[in-house]
Amino acid sequence: MPPKGWRKNTEGQYPQPNKDQDLVSIDEILFPRATVQKLAKNIMNASSDEGASNMILAKDSMIALQRSSTVFVSHLMFQARQISKDEGRKTINAQDILSALEKAEFSGFIPEVKQKLSVFESNIALRKKHKADKKVPKPEGVDASPSSKRLKDNDEQIIQRDNSADMEDDPEAEADEDITEELANDEDTNNKESKEEEEADEELDDEKDGEEVEENPIALLSREEDELRGEEAADEDEGQNSSDDDS
């Protein structure tokens, strides 16, 4: 339903509101309070003053830091976006940020930013190198089917057992060993359960064979009555035959 007060245009449609005209408050785009507080405490602890480490940030000071940092980063990104746009690029790189600092008259921050950037890049390089060292070379000539994958995993496990000194800290190998152990335990438990079920079925069959089938008591009574009636009929026939003989 359109907002109150809107009227249809000549085409019979309601005009759509312009999203660019929507006002955005600075409180909606503030940086996380914990991040800003951690950075501020690191700066205070890094200072040479003795009482700086015991300083506490007030609530109003934290709000001021959050808002000022948001405005600073927004202004810096605007300058960097203009530089990348002038060079015909759609992405912003590290050099654009350094040029934006110089253009925004914050040249004093450039040495500190370069130092932090070099530390960050070195950490990323070390992380990639450590990750590459952990990778195990795959054996050649192995298909990608599930059965071949299992054989490949088993081969890798044999290699890892032989070269335990080199592959001791490999988390992928430990995970593969845990998975194989779990599968083996599941197979053992399934076999035990199937054996127990078969034994229980055999015991039930033996009990059924050994037990005598009990007859219905009503059927027994009816059978006894039929037998008595048959005996009485036989006695009557004998009596009639004896009387005929006497006559």
UniProtKB/Swiss-Prot annotation:
GO biological process: DNA damage response; heterochromatin formation; leading strand elongation
Quaternary structure (record): Heterotetramer. Consists of four subunits: POL2, DPB2, DPB3 and DPB4.
Major location category of this protein: nucleus
Protein name per its UniProtKB record: DNA polymerase epsilon subunit D
Acidic residues bias locations: 165-188, 196-215, 224-247
Localization per record: Nucleus
Superkingdom of this protein's organism: Eukaryota
Its biological purpose: As accessory component of the DNA polymerase epsilon (DNA polymerase II) participates in chromosomal DNA replication.
Basic and acidic residues: bias regions: 150-159
Disordered: annotated segments: 128-247
PANTHER family with a match to the protein in the record: DNA POLYMERASE EPSILON SUBUNIT 3 (PTHR46172:SF1)
More details: In eukaryotes there are five DNA polymerases: alpha, beta, gamma, delta, and epsilon which are responsible for different reactions of DNA synthesis.
GO molecular function: chromatin DNA binding; protein heterodimerization activity
Keyword set, alphabetical order: DNA replication, Nucleus
GO cellular component, one term: epsilon DNA polymerase complex
